[in-house]
Each structure stands twice: as C-alpha cells, then as structure tokens.
Amino acid sequence: MQIGQRLGTPLSPSATRVMLLGAGELGKEVIIALQRLGVEVVAVDRYPDAPGHQVAHRAHVIDMTDPAALRAIVEAERPHLIVPEIEAIATDALAAIEAAGLAEVIPTARATQLTMNREGIRRLAAEELGLPTSPYAFADSFEAFSAAVAKIGMPCVVKPVMSSSGKGQSVVKTDADVKPAWDYAMAGGRVNHGRVIVEGFVDFDYEITQLTVRAIDPATLDTRTYFCEPVGHVQVAGDYVESWQPQPMSAVALEKSREIAHKVTEALGGRGLFGVELFVRGDDVWFSEVSPRPHDTGLVTLASQRQSEFELHARAILGLPVDPALGTPAASAVIYGGLDERGIAFEGVRDALAVPGADLRLFGKPESFAKRRMGVALATGATVDEARERAKRAAAAVRPVSAR
C-alpha cells in the first residue's frame, strides 16, 4: 500500500482494505469517513448487527480476545491496515500479525499493547515520560487493594485496569465504600479480571480531551502533530454525558495540555488520532488517560469542525493531509436507551431536530439498556453555552420507546 499516494476501488483487485476491530458508534463514523474516500472496509465486533456492521462492506462476529480467531480473520481478509476501536483485543496477536508483515496496525501494535489497559499507559506516562499524574497504585487482590486505598488516601478513584465507558469505576470516600468498590471493579473489567488501579483524587476545575493527530505533513512528508481545540466534557461514573468545543482555558494551561499530549502520542508513535484526557486546575494540568483512536467526547466534532475526529483519523491513517481547525462552537449530549429491550424505537425526533442548530446521531445498536448510549444530540451555537443548551434540549426531546 502506497501511503498517501494511491487509493483503490472497493471490491476490486485495486482496493485499499481497512479492517476495524470494534464496530460501535465511533467505529461506524470512522467507516463512513473511510468509505467516502473509496476505501473497502471490513468491520469486526463481538456481537452481530453492531452499528459499524450496518455500513461496512463486510462484517464478522468473533471473540477479538481469541488470538487464533483474530489471526484467522486477518489472514482471510488480508487488510492493508488494521484499526483497533476498542481495548478488548488480543494485542499480542496484533503484534505478531504486524511483525509477520500481514498488515499495518494503527497507530502501531506497541501502542495498542500499551493502551489496552490503564497500567501500561500510566507507567509510560508517569514513570518513563515523567508527566504529571495523580498518585496511583495497582492491586490484584482485595488485601492489596485495601492497602492501596490506605496508601493513596480517601477520596480515591478505583478503576479496572481494562474497561471502557466508565464500567467498574467508582469513588471511595469512606471505609464503607472499599468492599463495594472492589466488587464493582471486578464486575466491570472486560479482560484481566482481578487487577485495578487506585488513583488519588485530583481537585480539578474541569476535564478536557485534547484530540491530537499524528499525520503526514504534505510539505515535508514527515509525521507532524496537530491539535484540535480542547473539548470540555462532563462525566458521570466515568461515562461521558455531555461535551462541548472549545473549552475556555488559560493560554498557559492550553500550552501545558498540548505539551503533555505531544509527549505521550510521540512516545506511542504511528499515525492517527488520539484522545488525550487531562485534568485542569487553573494553570496546572494532569495527564489522565489516552486512547489511540477517536474519543466518545469527540463526537461533538461532527458539528464543530470542518473535519470531524473521524475524518481526521481516516485521513491520518491513510497518509493524507488533515485540517483540525474549529468551525463553530458546538456541543453534544447523550441519548440513553432508558429501557432494556431489543429493537427499540425513538419518538420526539421531529421536536429534537426543530431545535435551532441541532442534529442527531442514532447509533442503531440492536439492543438497548437503561444506561446504554443509543444516540447523541449535536448542536451549534454562537457560544458554547448556547450550543450546550440546544444539545441538551434536543437530547431531552428524544424518547426511547418499546417497539412491542
């Protein structure tokens, strides 16, 4: 594959083939961005009819933590690029696939190994790169966990080393919270059951996601780091419920945020978009986490930027020029399923889209749960505050209902 020079025709011998591992709502938008550039896309997920399956050229259902199954699907499809969109993947198998020359892993196989769990990336950030982080400790038994809580102090945040969307995450405020927090973390981890990170609580003013792109500079043909405007967000129990762009912040804090994002993404290497999560208090900034892929809080860029985070990711991995410039203030607000049922319907769509500057993304997930993210409302505005009000109003207008 000639990076940045040539794209083929899908479903033909000249096709540029990309395989996504994980086909949720973020993967779906990446697939759409790739298909607009004439890329042949294969979507893989652990359950059928995932959002990305519905728009890909081909779809597969496998256990992506099974190295043999992962290797087999790669050998059958022969993609040029493999794009992980979730953490629960047999990353050692990806490293072997890349080493064998079967495909290029985005951003790199090493990056997927380091970021697949919170331990790898925290040790890289704090111990190798010397980035400011909250105090932390790891534990793989309840006894070690209790000792870690005592060492870090209360309040502290407890997370499985491997989970997503806030699953298994809680705050320990008193001794009575210790055992429930351990049990909740054990239930919420996707893989590597039994290991958690205990983090000291950072008294921050706000959280941001610094969307950071490593892409080819067309002028020099070297890899260059680009930054989107900071994305502010609100999380509840570790799960994003609202985001907006740009987040107002001091010039000093913005510079520190970008320095941290540059250091950690440069250490991970490769091409693509990274979501770097940071805590900010005044001019001080702490590193929290990084995902080597589009970030859920970055859904706002579908409305705020000329090239969304998904288009930036698609262009970057293909070696094409990127433009992360902000177009307008915008916001996003999550639409939850509200009920446990397959094949739900949504009412109030007309009212939601009647909100000035509003748009919707209904993800098409086949099964709803009360707190499952089933869609998102987007809105633009003259200011961030206006955009946030509009997005929340549009989201509130959408009513998930039983299709029975």
UniProtKB/Swiss-Prot annotation:
Pathway: Purine metabolism; IMP biosynthesis via de novo pathway; N(2)-formyl-N(1)-(5-phospho-D-ribosyl)glycinamide from N(1)-(5-phospho-D-ribosyl)glycinamide (formate route): step 1/1. Its EC number is 6.3.1.21. ATP binds at residues 118, 159, 164-169, 199-202, 207. Pfam families: ATP-grasp, PurT_C, RS_preATP-grasp-like. Keywords: ATP-binding, Ligase, Magnesium, Metal-binding, Nucleotide-binding, Purine biosynthesis. Mg(2+) binds at residues 277, 289. Residues 123-318 form the ATP-grasp domain. Transmembrane segments: none annotated. One of its GO terms (cellular component) is cytosol. The keyword Glycoprotein does not apply. N(1)-(5-phospho-beta-D-ribosyl)glycinamide binds at residues 25-26, 85, 296, 365, 372-373. InterPro entries: ATP-grasp, ATP-grasp_carboxylate-amine, ATP_grasp_subdomain_1, PreATP-grasp_dom_sf, PurT, PurT/PurK_preATP-grasp, PurT_C, Rudment_hybrid_motif. One of its GO terms (biological process) is 'de novo' IMP biosynthetic process. NCBIfam families: PRK09288.1 (NF006766), purT (TIGR01142). Homodimer. This is Formate-dependent phosphoribosylglycinamide formyltransferase. The gene is purT.
